[in-house]
Curated annotation (Swiss-Prot):
This is NADH-ubiquinone oxidoreductase chain 5. The lineage of its organism: Eukaryota, Metazoa, Ecdysozoa, Arthropoda, Crustacea. It comes from Artemia salina. The keyword Electron transport applies. It is found in: Mitochondrion inner membrane. GO terms for molecular function: NADH dehydrogenase (ubiquinone) activity.
Amino acid sequence: MGELLYHEGDCGWVEEAGPSLIHHNSLRGSSLFSFLTSSPYKVLILSSLLFTLFMYSMA
């Protein structure tokens, strides 16, 4: 009986903490994504990616 109550409480904690953690991570991720895809950074990232690809192809 005590095990069942503990299990229920544990599930409730996970259920409660899960969405808020996911929401926090997605919020942080989307703000980072929008920061990186804003115009100057997009150019910088694309140019650095192209440069590294070019260097790997030359090596």
